[in-house]
From Swiss-Prot:
Location of the region described as Disordered in the Swiss-Prot/TrEMBL record: 117-139
One Gene Ontology molecular-function label: structural constituent of ribosome
Coiled-coil ranges per UniProt: none
Domain of life, source organism: Bacteria
Taxonomic source organism: Rhodospirillum centenum (strain ATCC 51521 / SW)
SUPFAM superfamilies on file: Prokaryotic ribosomal protein L17 (SSF64263)
Protein name, entry field: Large ribosomal subunit protein bL17
GO biological process entries: translation
Family: Belongs to the bacterial ribosomal protein bL17 family.
Keyword Ribonucleoprotein appears in the UniProt entry: yes
Database matches in PROSITE patterns: RIBOSOMAL_L17
Keywords: Ribonucleoprotein, Ribosomal protein
Assembly, per entry: Part of the 50S ribosomal subunit. Contacts protein L32.
GO cellular component: cytosolic large ribosomal subunit
Length: 139
């Protein structure tokens, strides 16, 4: 019997699951809102809440713990500066999970996980290739 066993496996190996949640946490910190399946969003929530709490505490040791999870210096800096400042007065509950219907292909329940009091400008930043127009070719 599987009584008292917490967490889901998502049909992935341990390393794949850890990498997936690391990537999803990076995306959530960067864009402040992501759409994924509802079970993944529910399992991502405590990971991100813990990271934001580390950012609020500050300090080198906590920065190293956050980097071990995120593996991205820019996101760790955002966590320890922007997000730590934004949530300094909030004692937890930094994220919300909203239901977002069902996926077309397999009817999987979808959800949106977002940071509370998020910055709407952060959504979609640095996504995809950037087209640079050369001024010398226009004339």
């Amino acid at each position: 019997m599987r009584h008292g066993i917490a967490g889901r496996k998502f049909n992935r190996t341990t390393s794949h699951r850890l990498a997936m949640f690391s990537n999803m946490a990076n995306a959530l910190i960067k864009h402040e809102q992501i759409k994924t399946t509802l079970p993944k969003a529910k399992d991502l929530r405590p990971i991100v809440e813990r990271l934001i709490t580390l950012g609020k505490k500050g300090g080198l040791a906590n920065k190293r713990l956050a980097y071990a999870e995120l593996r991205d210096h820019d996101m760790v800096e955002k966590l320890f500066t922007t997000l730590a400042e934004r949530y300094k007065g909030r004692p937890g509950g930094y994220t919300r999970v909203l239901k977002a219907g069902f996926r077309y292909g397999d009817a999987a329940p979808m959800g949106v996980i977002e940071l509370v009091d998020r910055d709407p400008e952060a959504k979609g930043q640095d996504s995809g290739p950037v087209e640079i127009k050369d001024e010398s070719e226009e004339g």
